Amino acid sequence: MSRIAKNSIKISNEISCKFENGTFFAKGKLGEMTLPVDSEYFVDISSDEIFVKPRNEKGKLNPKWGTIRSLISNIIKGVSEGFSKTLELNGTGYRASISGSILKLQLGFSHDINYSVPKEVKVECPKQNIIKLSSYSKEILGATAAKIRSYRKPEPFKGKGIKYENEFIFRKEGKKK
């Protein structure tokens, strides 16, 4: 039996949840999200907590049970608090600026990179070398941050590139004479 799946998910009064026709719905102050749930499981919603349970207790319980519980937990946290990631640009002349929904990146190429940010993600550039991303969807936020980081991954010799806020870049020694 999955240890994660046995735990309940606490919900606050400001979030409304329902489970209909194999789909979980959640609505909070930051937005609303849905999740299709496998037919082998159902979601039991009480006033202040949620349980994910298998429909057939005697059958083989597979790893999807804990995954579904974690996805629902992320949805609840997303619509109530939201998620955020911070990216740092390290390198001479590396900068970022935002205009509307276009993120303009100068990363040492002969041209600027214009990245169209998804509407679910909010972007801020408090400094020229810092990008703050926030969203109610952990999946979209992670994909957006990974796509921005992929334009110039940190290299191990000088550490130049785009990295996550607390990411450690393993440094290598250069050539020896």
Residue ranges and their predicted role:
Residues M1-K177:
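Ribosome-associated RNA-binding proteins
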